[in-house]
A protein has these predicted regions:
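Short beta-strand "wing" residues that participate in macromolecule-binding interfaces
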Residues: 68, 177, 428
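Active-site PLP attachment segment
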Residues: 71, 303-338
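N-terminal basic, amphipathic alpha-helical segments
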Residues: 1-141, 334, 344-351, 359-362, ...
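Conserved core of the PLP fold type I
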Residues: 148-278, 290-291, 296-304, 378, ...
């Protein structure tokens, strides 16, 4: 027997022996079908009455933990093993609701891993970012907490940060608004979901660019909406193809995801006229608009929104780092309170400390300096990448002016080309993964985290594989 028991004075001997054997079985020190000492041998070893051992064995046998085998002895039963297996077999399943059933349908994620050359999408160069923001930010205001800070701030977010964002979007995106028009969020995904929860009923029709950002489609489908898709041309979303009765359309006018181009001014105005006539809402995801490399900074769709039908959403994850989890939205004035109230019901959890930190960073000028510095770094990668893509005959680069990735149409099957490159240690991504109706056949090259020297080495491989 793999233990020796030292009895404690004042405690019942039989109970101590029972507990030792019982725990030994539960903890695996006494295994299924292991033979136990006879009552005579164990009583002699422990120096206790044989009747005490007999009573303990009888109790354990009654409970099913040990068994007697005639002419053989006493053994640990397999009761524990059966209990564990039974637990595994009898996992109880519950009926999911509509939202739970929809959420169980996980979207496909394409992400080749552990390749030496990865043109991954949507990830900034955090090595240059995280230490920069923490080094230059001060938390001096935490030493003198105002009631707003101490109680979590306004439903729309801290006033001071909304003031800073107000200045930022005015200078960089041409959007004239007041701090009262801005709602702080955890980022674009939360902004989209909150908007949909506020405005949609099951069965409503929403539309999106095709190819386009899958998160919007997935969230709308989760809530029971019908999904309409709208093809793109080189000017932007084809307005005349927007399905009738569309209640909300999701767009990325400044840097279309995933094709990378910007909407023309004429197409923006056409889209705004459509929304006014159809009493529809446009979600403008200001995706990657912070980065532009051809001395052109186009104004946001929201800046031309005279009829208050655009919900502009933005995030600081690409400028700083995703873990900061701060974004913003600028909805029509009539929707500010309903959306803010919905955020409250969802457990508004944008960190007050992070909001203070970001506000300090912006007010002290570090934000604009950092953005300028990152534009220089990304601009070098952008120009090198455009040059290398243009040197490959089977790639036709889609003109873009900024962002953190470039798209190139291919002659042939983009997915097959991707697979060839992945097998050669280079990760690129086909635009078809973001399309419902296969409206696109392009390869996507993200350059947020891949430095220029690695871009050049990767294209040596790409050229040899594709040519």
């Amino acid at each position: 027997m793999p233990f020796s028991l030292h009895f404690e004075t004042g405690k019942v001997t039989s109970q101590q022996l029972y507990s030792e054997i019982y725990q030994g079985i539960l903890e695996g020190r006494l295994r299924s079908n292991e033979r136990l000492p006879s009552t005579r041998m164990l009583s002699k070893k422990l120096g206790i009455a044989r009747n005490t051992v007999i009573s303990v064995y009888e109790r354990l046998q009654f409970e099913g933990w040990i068994v007697k085998k005639a002419g053989s002895g006493t053994y640990v039963s397999n009761a524990l093993e059966q209990t564990v297996n039974q637990d595994k077999r009898s996992i109880k399943h519950y009926q999911l609701g509509v939202f739970g059933t929809n959420a169980a349908k996980k979207p496909e994620i394409i992400a080749p891993k552990n390749l030496d050359y990865d043109f991954t999408l949507g990830v900034p160069d955090h090595q240059r970012i995280a230490k920069h923001i923490w080094r230059h930010s001060r938390l001096s205001r935490l030493n003198a907490l105002t009631p707003e800070f101490a109680h979590g701030g306004d439903l729309q977010g801290l006033t001071c940060l909304r003031e800073s964002i107000c200045e930022y979007v005015r200078h960089s995106r041409g959007v004239i608004c007041d701090p009262e028009d801005i709602i702080i969020t955890q980022g674009c995904q939360q902004a989209i979901m909150t908007t949909l929860l506020t405005l949609l009923s099951p069965g409503d029709l929403v539309s999106t660019e095709d190819p386009g950002y899958p998160v919007f489609r997935n969230q709308a489908r989760l809530l029971g909406a019908q999904i309409g898709t709208v093809p793109m041309d080189d000017q932007g979303v084809v307005v005349e193809s927007i399905p009738s009765n569309t209640k909300i359309i999701y767009t990325t006018p400044s840097h279309q995801f995933p094709l990378g181009f910007s909407y023309s001014v004429e197409r923006k105005l056409e889209l705004l006229r459509w929304a006014e006539v159809n009493n529809a809402i446009i979600i403008e995801d200001d995706y990657d608009a912070e980065y532009h490399y051809l001395n052109t900074s186009k104004q946001a769709l929201k800046s031309q929104d005279k009829n208050d039908c655009v919900i502009m959403i933005g995030s600081f994850s690409k400028i700083l780092f995703p873990g900061l989890r701060i974004g913003y939205m600028i909805p029509p004035k009539s929707l500010i309170d309903p959306i803010s109230n919905m955020l409250w019901h969802l457990g508004r959890s944008t960190s007050v400390v992070s909001q203070i930190l970001l506000d300090e960073f912006m007010r002290d000028g570090h934000f604009s300096h950092h953005l300028l510095n990152m534009n220089k770094i990304y601009s070098e990668r952008y120009h090198k990448l455009t040059q290398l893509i243009d040197n490959i005959d089977c790639l036709q680069r889609i003109p873009s002016q900024g962002g953190l990735h470039i798209a190139a149409e291919v002659s042939g099957c983009a997915t097959q080309m991707m697979n060839k490159l992945v097998s050669s240690n280079v990760a690129v991504y086909p635009s078809s993964h973001f399309s419902i109706n296969n409206h696109s056949n392009a390869l996507l090259f993200g350059f947020g985290i891949i430095p220029t020297p690695k871009i050049e080495k990767a294209f040596d491989i790409i050229q040899s594989v594709l040519d």
